[in-house]
Amino acid sequence: MSSKLVLVLNCGSSSLKFAIINPENGEEFLSGLAECFNLPEARLKWKMDGQKHEAALGAGAAHSEALNFIVNTILAEKPELSQQIAAIGHRIVHGGEKFTKSVVITDEVIKGIEAAIPFAPLHNPAHLIGIEEARKAFPHLINKMVAVFDTAFHQTMPEEAYLYALPYSLYKDHSIRRYGAHGTSHFFVSREAAKMLNKPVDELNVITCHLGNGGSVSAIVNGKCVDTSMGLTPLEGLVMGTRSGDIDPAIVFHLHDTLGMSVEDINKLLTKESGLLGLTEVTSDCRYVEDNYETKADAKRAMDVYCHRLAKYIGSYCALMEGRLDAIIFTGGIGENAAMVRELSLKKLALLGFEVDHQRNLDARFGKSGTITTDNSRLAVVIPTNEELVIAQDASRLTA
């Protein structure tokens, strides 16, 4: 076992994902999820030594109780594992314009994360709680904590990509611009694609599609992000599990003025009640949509809108590739497993030279990477993402 393992923490508003990883080879020694915070059924599930475990955290438990359980119960049984933790990596959803790369966490960095709260009001406060509680639980690692930002990879976007056509003062005075998300995933799969294609990263032109409950597409030219589908917040862009993605902004005024909805209700509608859930009126789960595509009108409707939007984004990003596209990459829970989403979306891009190989597409699921197009087609591939490994590697590198 390496003496330089990294504890990776991803703190959400009502959950905490964690893993202990060897940054050199990606081996996981512990992984788990604490969920249902502040509810009677608060619990923690984890996997260690190939065994799955679950425990109740107690009614109303949250980040503090979860981290205490990890330290005082799980790791107490494995002191040799605890002693190997040399750094802690924190996933941070929004770094604003301040953070263009991962950084060691200082009081100044914490202020920067606080300043970006308006752009990630659910996520950033939870990340700050996670940092505070981790400092208490691991006092000897206070100077060995690293923040890895979902927005950092997109900070190479040019002004024409990140500016909205709003009064320029809103950008200058209030930092209202496009930031993107899922940057760690887009970074990872683009680097894996460079290895797969045997190309230097700085010569790589790819379009990466991170499709999960949230989803985004990025245009990567010469290894750098030049555009991405999410905007000021993760609400812009693709159809998602419960998020609408792109809409006519005037719909907001219509919902308020004509239907009498409050701003809070509209926010909830667009972020929690739209997307696949809104289109099916049944579920946000893409597996339902795929399984029932041929037999249920709601599933077909949702799938068709989802793939139409995805194909539009991929097609538009082809215009940014400076004359050469090396591959389209699918990743994330849907991108890695939903063969139908990939096939229906790529069929719409036949003009660009894409032809799906049905069997290859079916084979590239459940954690398997691979080409999903025919030998005569422009290339599309599936690459499973590993954001935790990127976070672990950055934490290890910056605290060495």
Swiss-Prot record:
Gene3D superfamilies: 3.30.420.40
Cofactor note: Mg(2+). Can also accept Mn(2+).
Residues annotated to bind substrate: R91
Biological processes per GO annotation: acetate metabolic process; acetyl-CoA biosynthetic process
Residues given in the record as Mg(2+) binding sites: N10, E387
Cofactor(s) required for function per UniProt: Mg(2+); Mn(2+)
Keyword set, alphabetical order: ATP-binding, Cytoplasm, Kinase, Magnesium, Metal-binding, Nucleotide-binding, Transferase
Protein name: Acetate kinase
Organism: Proteus mirabilis (strain HI4320)
